[in-house]
Amino acid sequence: MNEILNTKDINTIGEFFIETWGCQMNEEDSEKLSGMLKKEGYIRTEERENADVIIFNTCCVRENAELKVYGNLGILKGLKSKNPNLIIAVTGCMMQQKGMAETIKKKFPFVDIIIGTHNLHNFPNYLNEVKKKDTSVLKIQEKEDSIIENMPIDRKNSMKAFVTIMYGCNNFCTYCIVPYVRGRERSRTPENIEAEIKKLISEGYKEITLLGQNVNSYGKDLEPNVTFAELLKRVNNIEGLERVRFMTSHPKDLTDDVIEAIAKCDKLCEQIHLPVQSGSSEILKKMNRHYDREKYLDVVSKIKKLIPNVALSTDIIVGFPGETEKDFEETLSLVKEVEYDSAFTFLYSIRKGTPAAKFEDQVPEDVKHKRFNRLVEVVNEISAKKNKAYEGKIEEVLVEGTSKNDENKLMGRTRTGKLVNFIGDKDSIGEFVNVKIIKANSFSLTGEEI
């Protein structure tokens, strides 16, 4: 008869649960954590209560993300009391902030592992250390190491995958914490990127999204230099790959070469996420964005000229310090002029350690909220109009699975990133099909397979 081992025994195979907050980079980091743990013999669970290891992968771009982490850690105290052998780990950008790891350990002493963004690859070692020595680990690496290649990765999707092409950011926008928690820009070699994509294709993947904090800066740190436009062309030539997307682009670095590459490369989807943040040149200067309203609109004009059917999306911050009614009106007018297919709108959130946190002319909360509501109304109106233009058209859709709202329907996305729910054959999941769009909704399209 086999002996039942204590869950803290090093040889025990257990279950793990990961909760992720934040951007696509964080999502991919969680896929790597999952890959490493599965390699160790762990099984993933979607139920916190069943887990032997719980990992929170955190975000600190906005205060709301941090508050969610605090709230969820508070809930875990009860689980830890019921199961003292439960191992709780917190990682990600929030932990990389100066003094945050110590704050978490003080507030939540039951947390076993606290690490940042630069030593994620060592997580299995830290886990084994906790299990073996019945101790806790708090290790925040201040500086980024060289890029770790070939990490195990457990991807959530079997047909679409994220491929990180670079890490970090050198831009230092005055509102943003990212350069402080993700480090300076480091690019992967094109050979390593191509190798990862080829492996994914061999496993049946159809669509790749190239990730970076600012993909347009790709390759500046490589010897010899490789531009993002050159990388796009190389990726486009990979046999068997069907679709390529990328994010995020910084307007100051979106060159004519990149726009031309998107227009000419047949696998590159006609979708560009181009964060504007504000329509006011005055505010953009205070944000340290390195472009003004005119320059941004010039880039948009070039994009629309070369890629007429492009879907543009953006990020907008409402209530940045010093934003006047005139500044906000300029944001509204820019949104109307560009006509974004979608926009991610945010209330300005003070991030400790950033220059903007010290700006004295903070906008009152009630003013921020009123402006936010006005902006969302305009954005949604334009999105609905853009979606309406798809009615009657036939679109190529990569079928991702059954619809979340109706199990009798399938769902997938067009090349321009539009979500389509449609009646079709379930055997089509994982394949490309043509769908006739019969109805436009506020945030999605409805159609039927033809």
Swiss-Prot record:
Cofactor-binding details, from the entry: Binds 2 [4Fe-4S] clusters. One cluster is coordinated with 3 cysteines and an exchangeable S-adenosyl-L-methionine.
Location (main, coarse): cytoplasm
Cofactor(s) this protein cannot do without: [4Fe-4S] cluster
MTTase N-terminal domain segment(s): 14-132
Keyword Coiled coil: no
Signal peptide (from-to): none
Keywords, sorted A to Z: 4Fe-4S, Cytoplasm, Iron, Iron-sulfur, Metal-binding, S-adenosyl-L-methionine, Transferase, tRNA processing
Assembly description: Monomer.
UniProt protein name: tRNA-2-methylthio-N(6)-dimethylallyladenosine synthase
Organism: Clostridium botulinum (strain Langeland / NCTC 10281 / Type F)
Gene responsible for this protein: miaB
